[in-house]
């Protein structure tokens, strides 16, 4: 209908209700201003009109039909959801509508639904008019888990009160996370104080007996943490020394290898020189042997000749 317009209600906490509100589009409705009087038959038809099963009218009725809303059907075996509570609260609160609430625009209704703290001027009179009635239903359906200190606060506005409830009411997960963070901060401060007392060099250089004597009076967790740090530092020092020794040994082996390669080259050169000398001596020996054999032949031929002077002597 053109004259119907949804009125802002506090946002529910049920996921199903939030999904319903997110999927509901208010921009498709038009606002038509018309006088309140002169159409009593229209108000009667609105009171007698039946709504479909499972649907909830999100528009206010211009003329209140009854001061007491119709109570929903109750069944012992029926599980009442938060969405049904929302429907019942919405239908009961819309019975008392101020005439000023009809001068609204879709933008004002959207701003009221998304939870703006600055309410439109048209809604302020309506909200102050139904504050007490809405506070009664909110105490029945939504504020069962609120502490007594929070319930004692003055109720200025239903929407503001709901935001304050969500901001100030401590949840179990939030309290547990805050206590865990405080515990971790205390542990970190105590461990940092113990670790700052001893330097890394002192932890490594001290013996176990000296360390136990210095750790008297500390908690068990601090002692275990400090000993674990000392063990880590010693293992790190051992690893660094082993790495240094390994690198140094590698350099030494590489230097020895270079020297041995040079010595091998020198020995090869010496062998080649000796081989050349051997060949030269062998050639010289062969030449001497050939000369001796030729001289011996010449001497033998002269001794066999009878005409030589030596033959007669």
UniProtKB/Swiss-Prot annotation:
Compartments it resides in: Nucleus
Compositional bias per record (Low complexity), positions renumbered to this chain: 55-76, 167-192
Region (Basic motif): 225-250
Protein's gene: mafb
Record's signal peptide: none
Keywords (A to Z) from UniProt: Activator, DNA-binding, Nucleus, Repressor, Transcription, Transcription regulation
GO CC field: nucleus
Function: Acts as a transcriptional activator or repressor. Implicated in the regulation of cell-type specific gene expression and play a role in inductive events during lens development.
Molecular-function annotations in GO: DNA-binding transcription factor activity, RNA polymerase II-specific; RNA polymerase II cis-regulatory region sequence-specific DNA binding
Organism: Xenopus laevis (African clawed frog)
Iron listed as a keyword: no
Record's protein name: Transcription factor MafB
Biological processes annotated in GO: regulation of DNA-templated transcription; regulation of myeloid cell differentiation; regulation of transcription by RNA polymerase II
């Amino acid at each position: 209908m053109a004259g119907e317009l949804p009125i802002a209600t506090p946002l529910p906490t049920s996921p199903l209700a939030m999904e319903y509100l997110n999927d509901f589009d208010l921009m498709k409705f038009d606002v038509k201003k018309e006088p309140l009087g002169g159409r009593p038959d229209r108000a009667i038809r609105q009171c007698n009109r039946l709504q479909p099963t499972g649907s909830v009218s999100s528009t206010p009725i211009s003329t209140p039909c009854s001061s007491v809303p119709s109570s929903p059907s109750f069944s012992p075996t029926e599980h009442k959801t938060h969405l049904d509570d929302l429907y019942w609260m919405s239908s009961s609160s819309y019975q008392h509508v101020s005439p000023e609430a009809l001068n609204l625009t879709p933008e004002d209704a959207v701003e009221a639904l998304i939870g703006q703290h600055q309410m439109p001027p048209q809604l302020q009179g309506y909200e102050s008019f139904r504050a007490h009635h809405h506070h009664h239903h909110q105490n029945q359906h939504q504020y069962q888990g609120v502490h007594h200190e929070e319930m004692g606060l003055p109720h200025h506005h239903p929407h503001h009160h709901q935001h304050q409830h969500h901001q100030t009411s401590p949840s179990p997960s939030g309290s547990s996370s805050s206590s865990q963070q405080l515990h971790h901060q205390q542990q970190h401060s105590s461990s940092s104080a113990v670790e700052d007392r001893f330097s890394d060099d002192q932890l490594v250089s001290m013996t176990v007996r000296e360390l136990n004597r210095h750790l008297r009076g500390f908690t068990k967790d601090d002692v275990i943490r400090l000993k674990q740090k000392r063990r880590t530092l010693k293992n790190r020092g051992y690893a660094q020394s082993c790495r240094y020794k390994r690198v140094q040994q590698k350099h030494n082996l590489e230097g020895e290898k270079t020297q041995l390669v040079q010595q091998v080259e020198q020995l090869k050169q010496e062998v080649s020189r000796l081989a050349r000398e051997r060949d030269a001596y062998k050639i010289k020996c062969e030449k001497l042997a050939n000369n001796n054999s030729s001289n011996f032949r010449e001497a033998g031929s002269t001794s066999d000749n009878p005409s030589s002077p030596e033959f007669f002597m």
